[in-house]
């Protein structure tokens, strides 16, 4: 899957963005990279689902399908990931954006685990 390759590349860039200095510019760049990586995650999930005759119409249905495939643990709370993604779509600076920025490391770990699971299933 070429889309999986793009997703993994974006994950690497997200990790780099998170590790940058804690300036307004770098925070904005990290949040933008999170948005892009999230979109690629969904695109990748949909590609795998389509191969198996499944259609994910919503973000929630995509992550539920991933959980059914056991690519994420049942305890994984992906709903925070989805909620934070939706919040940054509004893109307002302030406390909420700062909170999401602080959660990016957790979101990265979840997305990275998902990417690793997809890679193993592909092989």
Predicted regions and their residues:
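Solvent-exposed interaction patches of small proteins and small membrane subunits
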Residues: 1-123
């Amino acid at each position: 899957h070429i889309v999986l390759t793009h997703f993994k590349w974006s994950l690497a860039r997200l990790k780099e963005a998170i590790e940058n200095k804690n300036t307004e510019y770098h925070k904005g760049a990290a949040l933008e990279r999170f948005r892009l990586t999230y979109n690629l995650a969904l695109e990748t999930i949909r590609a795998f689902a389509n191969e198996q005759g499944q259609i994910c119409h919503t973000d929630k249905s995509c992550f539920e399908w991933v959980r059914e495939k056991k690519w994420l643990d049942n305890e994984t709370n992906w709903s925070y990931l989805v909620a934070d993604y939706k919040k940054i779509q509004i893109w307002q600076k302030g406390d909420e954006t700062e909170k999401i920025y602080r959660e990016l490391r957790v979101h990265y770990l979840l997305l990275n685990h998902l990417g690793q699971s997809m890679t193993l299933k592909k092989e």
